[in-house]
Design a protein with these regions (language model features):
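Vicinal oxygen chelate
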Residues: 5-13, 43, 64-137
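N-terminal beta-strand motif that seeds the catalytic metal site of vicinal oxygen chelate
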Residues: 1-16, 74-75, 129-137
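Short, charged/polar, Gly/Pro-enriched secondary-structure boundary elements
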Residues: 50-56, 119-122
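Acetyl-CoA-dependent GNAT
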Residues: 59-64, 128-130
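Core segments of cupin and vicinal oxygen chelate
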Residues: 2, 9-54
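Alpha-helical elements of the RecA-like P-loop NTPase motor core of helicases
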Residues: 19-20, 86, 123-124
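Short, solvent-exposed loop/turn elements at beta->coil junctions and helix N-caps
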Residues: 33-35, 62-63, 103-106
Length: 137
């Protein structure tokens, strides 16, 4: 069998804040939670309908994420329209989390913005990339 990408696991300082961020801004829901101690508590989150395909695994015990401005490493989420990118950016700015304001780029980047999650990870929201909603435009 060919390997299949199933999850991305990363440490977070405050599990409750991180779960709230990914629920509010990315629409993810908890599908699994296990562990009890401060170093073994994990929460699995995914999108509706993708429970058996791909999950984010949030692991308690992170130190925070330091990322240089020139480092474009990020988690990417597609949204259904440019106005949805603008709406995420507006809510992110109000919460003090906006890292990249909305901007249009040539294909394949599309229209995008990014927020910093509670640990400092960049989370991109895009429309018009060749993946997800807007891929056909």
């Amino acid at each position: 069998m060919k390997p299949v990408f199933t999850h991305c696991a990363f440490h977070v300082r405050d599990l409750e804040r991180s779960v709230a961020f990914y629920r509010e801004f990315c629409g993810l829901k908890i599908v699994e939670e296990h562990g009890e101690g401060p170093n073994d508590h994990a929460v699995w989150m995914t999108e509706d309908g993708r429970e058996g395909e791909y999950v984010f695994v949030l692991l308690l015990g992170g130190l925070g994420h330091q990322q240089r401005d020139a480092d474009l490493s990020h988690f990417g989420f597609a949204v259904g329209s440019k106005s949805e990118v603008d709406e995420v950016a507006h809510r992110g700015q109000a919460a003090g989390m906006l890292a990249w304001p909305p901007k249009a780029f040539p294909f394949p980047v599309g229209y995008r913005c990014a927020l910093r999650d509670p640990d400092g990870y960049l989370v991109e929201f895009s429309y018009g990339q060749p993946l997800g909603p807007g891929a056909e435009t």
